[in-house]
């Protein structure tokens, strides 16, 4: 098998010129679209992931109605910063609902964790060697472009993340069985975010393996569930830079390549659960930059996130 990353290309895309002008469907068309829709969970990791998921909610609301799609599509966003993103739908600002779609996994007491690391087995095993090199600050406004802070935030808030993922997956699985009785349709999972920062880049692989582990609870239906990843590269952030943009991206892609090609993931989580898997975390992974096929750069990260949201909708 060849190197996984050698087969990947930054996905070119046309600007979503009609993103803000997509008309609402009539009721018959909306119902037909819903009946064709496979149960889908879209997970946003970090601020970029939250933007994508919010824009997707705007599209779903505009095209299918404010509530009609929620039995078939679940949206979750996990971020370490308390930021609100809005998308337009029928002249109305659409936002993710706090504590139902949008979850804050920040407010991590890093100094206290450092002092009590001996009693925190899951965190010590994953991050014990690197924690002393990190700034002893309470994470209240993002992961400081530090990937270990992203993973630490997920582990510190593990119960919240695990429970919300499980609730969404079981809702979609149960709903699908109730509607059609056909378990072979399975569930589509999309995990999206940037590879350049701390939260998304530090959590996307663990999120995928947590979802894989939760799939096993579905029995035979798990065979028909698929995970797709979407990661944004530094070029998707025109005019924005940071000292860790390139190192974070390189580290994230190296870890992704290792797990996709060689597989083999083992980690203990704070509830004592050990996930040991030989499966690749994703069935498919797309990397997205900020340049289209003509070599023109997208205007800003918001435009790129809108493009990704439209791709997910279509």
Language model features with spans:
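Tubulin/FtsZ superfamily GTPase core signature
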Residues: 1-314
């Amino acid at each position: 098998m060849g190197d996984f990353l050698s087969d990947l290309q930054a996905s070119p895309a046309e600007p979503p010129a009609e993103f803000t002008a997509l008309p609402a469907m009539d009721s018959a068309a909306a119902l037909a679209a819903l009946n064709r829709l496979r149960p889908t969970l879209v997970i946003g990791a970090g601020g970029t992931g939250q933007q994508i998921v919010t824009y997707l909610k705007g599209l779903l609301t505009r095209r299918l109605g404010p509530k009609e799609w929620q039995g078939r599509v679940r949206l979750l966003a996990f971020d370490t910063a308390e930021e609100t993103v809005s998308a337009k739908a029928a002249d109305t600002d659409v936002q993710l609902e706090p504590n139902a779609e949008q979850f804050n996994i920040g407010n991590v007491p890093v100094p206290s964790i450092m002092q009590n690391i001996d009693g925190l087995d899951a965190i010590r095993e994953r991050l014990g060697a690197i924690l002393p090199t990190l700034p002893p600050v309470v994470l209240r406004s993002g992961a400081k472009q530090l990937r270990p802070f992203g993973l630490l935030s997920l582990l510190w808030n593990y119960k919240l993340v695990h429970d919300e993922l499980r609730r969404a997956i079981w809702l979609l699985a149960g709903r699908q069985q109730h509607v059609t009785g056909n378990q072979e349709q399975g569930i589509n999972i999309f995990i999206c975010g940037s590879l350049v920062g701390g939260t998304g880049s530090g959590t996307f692989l663990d999120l995928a393996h947590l979802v894989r582990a939760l799939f096993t609870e579905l029995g035979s239906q798990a065979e028909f569930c698929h995970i797709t990843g979407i990661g944004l590269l530094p070029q998707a952030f025109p005019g924005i830079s940071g000292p860790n943009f390139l190192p974070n991206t390189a580290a994230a892609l190296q870890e992704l390549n290792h797990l996709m090609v060689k597989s083999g993931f083992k980690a203990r989580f704070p509830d004592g659960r050990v996930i040991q898997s030989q499966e690749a975390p994703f069935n498919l992974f797309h990397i997205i930059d900020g340049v289209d096929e003509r070599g023109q750069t997208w205007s800003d990260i918001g435009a790129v996130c809108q493009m990704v949201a439209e791709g997910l909708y279509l």
